[in-house]
């Protein structure tokens, strides 16, 4: 493990032309201190997590000391927000400090959120507050623990600097780590400002650093100089195809775990299919497909059940921005593959949650009838699947079924519809080759528990951690970090974090304010 000063920076993005961003020096926070560090993320960077406690670390990531090797940059991008194009976007409260290169040649962006004003801050103060920073810190750990691609947060730092929001709050910084911070909006910016040469340059950059397998062999690269324009376009079509696939896989993951992003603007969409920008996000408590986690989303544009279609809308916006590089007919053909990838990945995830190995056509009926059941009974989505993970094939037999149904008593107001669905589920399980044997069924249940988490970041838990942190107690942040980093494990000492939310906990309203 390395010390902070031993990290190797290779800042490729800052070497791009100045139209891609503006060099900015972070503005200092007063009396900074460490709130929490994520050891898993530190390990990704080959950084000793104990470094986070040093004054060098704390000062370097709160604008009080320049970190050697970094080249702070506010990235310029635009995007569609709630369906409307906004040309005045960019890093308004954060800076790309640089890119850390590990011993395995993995490259990680280091981004400082809450670093102060930039040319893209508009009327904002460029700051982040402790409240929203805690949510992103824990939210990214939760998605990563669930096996869904996301940005990461290395550490969270607090200060005595006061920031004006609905009330005066403590300023904070979050050290965000990601494979890339490139958004759909980066390409939209270059397209709508008619910088087509730079658009091609950015596409080439993305392919070189993140999709190198799309590149041809060295000899074929030399032949590119004489290739026809249409031949040259093929690699950009392959790039868009990859982005469509990654986005579809991401949305399948979100829908399977009940995650609602809340503000799926194109400037919040990662070209690498990462969960990006944790604002008013939320996880389903009771299963409600119409769930709106952002109280500013009056029309429900970004409701939970709208996420698959919105992702395609966003991909269409990206595809349009790439038309200087890809024929429109090719863009349309690539976009048409989205639903197939989404359905394939989502169905696979749902079969895993139900302990089904074989793919059968009637599975869609089993899925839809289950969702109708959960919605009609307002059943807790996560607790249902976790409980189901302890129900063996034998438990579903005629003689054992009544006892099995009792395990769901706390989740259902009426168990008759549940009994009907469980009988259909038992029939479906009978088609699985290994459930007839005890060992095979035990293995199935073990696998189910690896796909049905015991712990998710419920809004009320995040709020409790925030309330304690604002009083100077960061214990709950670290406790939640522990269970969310491995949410499929039992963590018996933290059973209370797996409970159904209290009534007030289901009614929390989350805004974009950060």
Curated annotation (Swiss-Prot):
Cofactor needs: Mg(2+); Mn(2+)
Entry's EC annotation: 2.7.7.-, 2.7.7.108
GO molecular function annotations of the record: AMPylase activity; ATP binding; magnesium ion binding
EC class of the enzyme, as a word: transferase
UniProt binding sites for Mg(2+): 268, 277
InterPro entries xrefs: SelO
Entry annotation: catalytic residues: 267
Keywords, alphabetical: ATP-binding, Magnesium, Manganese, Metal-binding, Nucleotide-binding, Nucleotidyltransferase, Transferase
Catalyzed reaction equations: L-seryl-[protein] + ATP = 3-O-(5'-adenylyl)-L-seryl-[protein] + diphosphate; L-threonyl-[protein] + ATP = 3-O-(5'-adenylyl)-L-threonyl-[protein] + diphosphate; L-tyrosyl-[protein] + ATP = O-(5'-adenylyl)-L-tyrosyl-[protein] + diphosphate; L-histidyl-[protein] + UTP = N(tele)-(5'-uridylyl)-L-histidyl-[protein] + diphosphate
Binding residues annotated for ATP, in chain numbering: 90, 92-93, 113, 125-126, 176, 183, 277
Pfam families noted in UniProt: SelO
Family of this protein: Belongs to the SELO family.
PANTHER family documented for this protein: PROTEIN ADENYLYLTRANSFERASE SELO, MITOCHONDRIAL
NCBIfam families: PRK00029.1
Function summary: Nucleotidyltransferase involved in the post-translational modification of proteins. It can catalyze the addition of adenosine monophosphate (AMP) or uridine monophosphate (UMP) to a protein, resulting in modifications known as AMPylation and UMPylation.
Name of the protein in its database record: Protein nucleotidyltransferase YdiU
Originating organism: Photobacterium profundum (strain SS9)
Gene: ydiU
């Amino acid at each position: 493990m390395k010390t902070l000063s031993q990290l190797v920076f290779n800042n490729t993005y800052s070497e791009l032309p100045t139209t891609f961003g503006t060099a900015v020096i972070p503005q200092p926070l007063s009396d900074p201190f460490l709130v929490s560090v994520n050891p898993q993320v530190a390990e990704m960077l080959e950084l000793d997590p104990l470094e986070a406690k040093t004054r060098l670390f704390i000062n370097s990531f709160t604008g009080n000391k320049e970190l050697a090797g970094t080249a702070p940059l506010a990235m310029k991008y635009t995007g569609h927000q709630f369906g409307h194009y906004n040309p005045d976007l960019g890093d308004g409260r954060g800076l790309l400090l640089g890119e850390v290169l590990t011993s395995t040649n993995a490259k990680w962006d280091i981004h400082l959120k809450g670093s102060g004003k930039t040319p893209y801050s508009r009327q904002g103060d460029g700051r982040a507050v402790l409240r929203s920073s805690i949510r992103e810190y824990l939210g990214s750990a939760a998605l990563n623990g669930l096996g869904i691609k996301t940005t990461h947060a290395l550490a969270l730092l607090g200060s005595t600097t006061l920031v004006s929001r609905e009330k005066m709050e403590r300023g904070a910084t979050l050290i965000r780590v990601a494979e890339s911070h490139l958004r759909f909006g980066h390409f939209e910016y270059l397209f709508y400002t008619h910088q087509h040469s730079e658009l091609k340059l950015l596409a080439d950059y993305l392919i070189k650093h993140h999709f190198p397998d799309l590149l041809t062999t060295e000899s074929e690269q030399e032949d590119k100089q004489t290739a026809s324009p249409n031949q040259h376009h093929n690699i950009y079509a392959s790039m868009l195809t990859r982005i469509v696939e990654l986005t579809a896989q991401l949305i399948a993951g979100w829908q399977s775990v009940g995650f609602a992003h809340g503000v799926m603007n194109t400037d919040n969409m990662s070209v690498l299919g990462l969960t990006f920008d944790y604002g008013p996000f939320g996880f389903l408590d009771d299963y409600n497909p119409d769930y709106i986690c952002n109280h500013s989303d009056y029309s429900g544009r970004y409701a939970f059940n709208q996420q698959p279609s919105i992702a395609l809308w966003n991909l269409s916006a990206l595809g349009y921005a790439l038309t200087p590089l890809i024929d429109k007919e090719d863009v349309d053909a690539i976009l048409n593959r989205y639903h197939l990838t989404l359905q394939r990945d989502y169905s696979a995830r749902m079969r895993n949650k139900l302990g089904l190995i074989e793919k059968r056509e009637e599975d869609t009926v089993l899925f839809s009838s289950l969702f109708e059941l959960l919605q009609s009974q307002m059943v807790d989505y996560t607790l249902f699947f976790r409980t189901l993970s302890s129900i063996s094939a034998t438990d579903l037999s005629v003689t054992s079924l009544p006892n099995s149904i009792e395990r769901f008593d706390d989740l259902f107001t009426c168990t008759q519809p549940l009994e009907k669905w469980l009988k259909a589920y038992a029939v479906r399980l009978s088609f699985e080759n290994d459930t007839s044997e005890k060992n095979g069924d035990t293995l199935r249940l073990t696998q189910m528990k690896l796909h049905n988490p015991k712990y998710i970041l419920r809004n009320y838990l995040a709020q409790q951690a925030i309330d304690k942190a604002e009083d100077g107690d960061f214990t709950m942040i670290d406790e939640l970090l522990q269970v969310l980093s491995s949410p499929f494990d039992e963590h018996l000492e933290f059973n209370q974090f797996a409970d159904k939310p209290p009534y007030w906990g289901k009614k929390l309203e989350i805004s974009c304010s950060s």
